[in-house]
């Protein structure tokens, strides 16, 4: 049964030859690829995304344009650094940003119960988001 699930998951990933053909036919300047990451908050609580680096490398060699990693929340920084070496130039991390935002906002609202100025409350929240974004940008620098 596990073998069938693995086979089904592989069928949902980007086929390097199809990616090459798609890029050639459309002339797109970047390509979102399915290489093992997942969208949405549920994945963060169930398992860490596991990037198929062999597939990613093969796609990168064939298409020679920047690649986009959707569902990048929760991907370890070391994996993002490695993915950048295989052409990943954009990583979508919406879920990770939402979680950081809500955690910081809840913390500040609990900590500053009498504060009424949103600028005071939101300054640390923005800082929390900045920390996440800076970490990802550092990981993707070549």
What are these regions (language model features)?
Residues 1-63, 77-88, 99, 103-107, ...:
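Alpha/beta enzyme core
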Residues 33, 40, 73, 95, ...:
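Flexible, active-site-adjacent loop/turn segments at secondary-structure boundaries
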Residues 31-33, 67-71, 89-93:
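Hydrophobic faces of well-ordered beta-strands that scaffold small-molecule active sites
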Residues 8-11, 44-48, 69-72, 94, ...:
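Glycine- and other small-residue-rich loops at beta-strand/loop junctions that grip anionic moieties
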Residues 108-142:
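Extended, intrinsically disordered, low-complexity segments
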